[in-house]
Curated annotation (Swiss-Prot):
The keyword ATP-binding belongs to this UniProt entry's keyword annotation: no
InterPro entries: Rota_A_VP4, Rota_VP4_MID_sf
GO cellular component, one term: host cell plasma membrane
Protein family according to the UniProt entry: Belongs to the rotavirus VP4 family.
Keyword Protein transport: no
Site (Probable cleavage): 207-208, 214-215
HAMAP family hit by this protein: Rota_VP4
Keywords: Capsid protein, Hemagglutinin, Host cell membrane, Host endoplasmic reticulum, Host membrane, Host-virus interaction, Membrane, Outer capsid protein, Viral attachment to host cell, Viral penetration into host cytoplasm, Viral penetration via permeabilization of host membrane, Virion, Virus entry into host cell
Gene Ontology biological process terms from the UniProt entry: permeabilization of host organelle membrane involved in viral entry into host cell; virion attachment to host cell
Stated name of the protein: Outer capsid protein VP4
Length: 751
């Protein structure tokens, strides 16, 4: 069992089989001692007196045929139809509604007449004393042929299907549904004895419909484990929450937008019980719409919002507290209603505004919409504020006409207009005959939150402890492990994008420079947040463990990492205290709103400290053998003063004594690892690279430094801080650009 708990369940119904656990065939049945259930607990026969026992556990593998079917439960048939096949094993409970898709391939006949595919929903088979009548509903306004009606009815006879011939095949897919959605009713009468059922009435109807929404098809108990197959109805509520960031000189440009990965909790009633459910909606939009003109003045609006357009996909994770997946350690054979579809429409006012008085802050816009349908589902491991463990994942795909106007020459299509969205101007040119460049069909991220709702029927098989006293995690042990961190990553990306936009026009906010002007106050800030910070860092490690990114060949280069080993500071004197480095990161990532409200965002801060920093070492601290090693390929000369390894881009930089030039070389990861290993006895990990150090050292308003003085200052953090405090805003902005680039590189690896 431990092997199963160590492995993470994989999405889309895939599983991982652990060798030596449930698949093991080496147990000796003669030595086994079977547990006996007494008063709800499991005991072993004491009189046997064995000191050790083993249990012959049966492997539970994907693709095995089901066993121990309980014939007292109604089970609609799904599979290929041949003579003798029955569509149900017993009479369905009253109120049962079935959706039946008959897909015919090849030449198939019933009673010597060829039959075609048909999709229907059936709500009853009744008997009036002389004949049986089936009532159904077709998905289209076409009269069903007599042969199609026979195909539907014959399987409900107690004798089963008779009279099917031909070299083709008929595939039947049956699902239990909650309400009839097909509109075109038909009936058919026969005299053969058949299974009958119809609508329920009064209190009985309510009770039976509740039972029909949840059916245990079979339940097998073997020792500690119980295997169940369940079919149930769920209410799915995807939640679409847009976000965006206004930037630029005057906060009039939309620089980023999209949909959050949003967790939504709600309740509904099923079987007379209140079901507490949670969905996590992950939207993957690819479209953009709106005006995009980089030459526009900063006082005007510019920018495109993100659009969920046809062919885009979104996924919805779902879990609840009343299904059999709770406490399950294994799941397989997921099936779901394949007919769910819907439409997302932009509603409400635009959430973005320009930085003017309210009467002038509005932005011309138009919302759009997009249709979507269910495509597939499976199982996934989820980690939210309410639950840690198994969930189902349902995938949806948008469909319709995909459209984007990449110029002003597309004529207006009135049928397409309701789907078009735009921001920054009218979506058509003057005259209304052509779409404006940037018009796109789809659901835009820029309006009110949107919640859709779907009733779905799902089926699955799970393995769980048969003793209710055993627990495997789930709601009782669920914690917010990574969802807040993932949100912090997006928040940090928003802040980086906003700061970069401001830097492009030399209008950096004062929050960036709090780190420079108030360095002396920083150590006290971090004295009381150790526990909070450690929690966030541990959560980031869990998030990294689920990432598909390659492992960096260079380790221990982050500003804070429990594996970082501090080395003797032989290369840099008066080294900047770590609290100062943390302060520069912390205050740089702190928004004006947080400063005004005297609040802190430690999760975002913890994410920022994951960036990889350069290692710097003076050449005179390196061994002779290693210097010769670098000189062979021409990476080091006799005039070099220092070397630097930057794990962000696997670059080796050397500082020349003459003119204080910095030469960069792109090297492979193996060589980077070798260089760092040989530098480990003398290197200094630093927030400031050689380039930043040189730029700071050269900015001295009192005298023009010599190259020798520049080099000396570059390796004296005390002098660097003194100069840094007196830099003007423009110069500090240039230095800060590398710092932001380093964080952006880290975010790409974590996303």
């Amino acid at each position: 069992m431990l092997a199963y708990l160590r492995r993470e369940w994989q999405s889309y119904g895939e599983t991982v089989i652990a060798e030596g656990t449930f698949n093991s065939t080496s147990s000796d049945s003669s030595q086994s001692e079977k547990p006996i259930k007494t008063d709800g607990r499991y005991c072993y026969q004491a009189e046997i007196g064995r000191n050790a026992y083993s249990m012959d556990a049966r492997g539970f593998m994907l693709g095995e045929s089901d066993r121990h079917v309980d014939t007292t439960q109604f089970l609609p048939y799904t599979g290929y139809i041949t003579d003798g096949i029955k569509y149900c094993n017993i009479e369905p409970p009253c109120g049962t509604l079935l959706r039946m898709h008959f897909d015919v391939s090849g030449d198939v006949s019933v009673d010597m007449h060829r039959v075609a595919s048909i999709y229907v929903e059936v709500d009853s088979v009744t008997y009036d004393g002389s004949q049986y009548t089936i009532r159904g509903y077709r998905d289209r306004n076409l009269t069903a042929t007599e042969t199609q009606k026979k195909l539907i009815f014959y399987g409900f006879r107690k004798l089963g299907m008779i009279g099917m011939t031909g070299n083709g095949r008929v595939m039947l897919t049956s699902t239990i549904i909650q309400k009839i959605s097909y509109k075109h009713q038909f009936t058919f009468q026969m005299h053969s004895e058949s299974y009958v059922w119809g609508p329920c009435s009064g209190r009985i109807k309510t009770r039976v419909q509740g039972n029909d929404s949840r059916i245990i098809i079979y339940e097998q108990e073997d020792g500690f484990w119980k295997i169940l197959k369940e079919t149930l109805w769920i209410k799915l509520k995807p939640y679409f929450k847009p976000y965006g960031t206004m930037g630029g000189a005057f906060k009039n440009w939309l620089i980023d937008s999209g949909f959050e990965k949003h967790e939504y909790t709600y309740s509904y009633e099923r079987d007379g019980q209140v079901v507490n459910a949670t969905t996590v909606t992950y939207v993957k939009p690819t479209g953009k719409a709106g005006i995009n003109q980089s030459w526009r003045p900063a006082t005007d609006y510019n920018g495109q919002f993100t659009v969920l357009q046809p062919e885009d996909e979104f996924s919805v994770w779902y879990f609840e507290d009343k299904w059999q997946i709770s406490q399950a350690i294994y799941a397989k054979n997921f099936q779901s209603d394949s007919q769910v579809e819907g439409e997302l429409t932009n509603n409400g006012a635009l959430i973005f505004k320009m930085n003017y008085i309210p009467s002038l802050a509005g932005i011309t816009n138009k919302g759009g919409k997009v249709k979507y349908r269910y495509i597939s589902g499976g199982f996934a491991q989820i980690d939210t504020s309410r639950h840690t463990g198994l969930a189902i994942i349902l995938n949806f795909k948008c469909y319709g006409k995909k459209f984007y106007a990449d110029n002003n020459n597309y004529p207006v299509d009135n049928a397409l207009n309701p789907y078009i969205c735009y921001i920054g101007d009218s979506y058509t040119l003057s005259g209304g005959t052509h779409y404006r460049q940037g018009a796109c069909a789809g659901f835009a991220a820029g309006y009110d939150d949107e919640i859709t709702e779907h009733d779905m029927t799902i089926s699955y098989t799970v393995m769980k402890p048969s003793d209710p006293d055993f627990v495997t995690g789930g709601d009782n042990y669920g914690q917010t492990v990574t969802s807040d961190i993932e949100r912090s990553i997006r928040d940090l990306q928003d802040q980086i994008n906003s700061i970069l936009a401001e830097m492009n026009i030399q209008q950096v906010t004062s929050a960036v420079f709090t780190a420079i002007t108030n360095l002396g106050e920083l150590p006290s800030l971090f004295s009381n947040i150790t526990k909070v910070f450690n929690r966030a860092k541990d959560n980031i490690k869990k998030l990294r463990s689920r990432s598909n990114s390659d492992i960096s060949p260079i380790g221990a280069t982050k500003i804070i990492d429990k594996t970082t080993l501090e080395t003797p500071q032989l290369s840099v004197i008066n080294r900047m205290p770590e609290e100062y480095e943390l302060g520069i990161i912390y205050n740089s990532m702190r928004t004006r709103k947080l400063i005004d409200e005297r609040k802190h965002d430690f999760d975002t801060f913890a994410v920022a400290t994951e960036m990889e920093l350069p290692y710097i070492s003076k050449v005179n601290t390196l061994t002779k053998e290693f210097k010769d090693y670098l000189k062979k390929p021409g990476l080091l000369s006799n005039d070099d003063v220092a070397v630097q390894i930057d794990p962000m881009n696997n670059r080796l930089s050397v500082l020349r004594r003459k003119y204080a030039d910095i030469i960069e070389y792109k090297i492979d990861p193996e060589l980077a690892h070798e260089v760092l290993s040989n530098m480990s006895n003398s290197a200094t990990r630093s927030l400031f690279s050689l380039n930043v150090r040189k730029q700071i050292a050269m900015n001295n308003s009192f005298s023009e430094p010599t190259f020798s003085q520049i080099i000396d200052r570059m390796f004296d953090d005390g002098q660097l801080i003194d100069v840094l405090n007196n830099l003007n805003r423009e110069t500090a902005t240039e230095l800060f650009d590398e710092f932001l680039t380093r964080i952006k590189s880290m975010l790409v690896k974590m996303s």
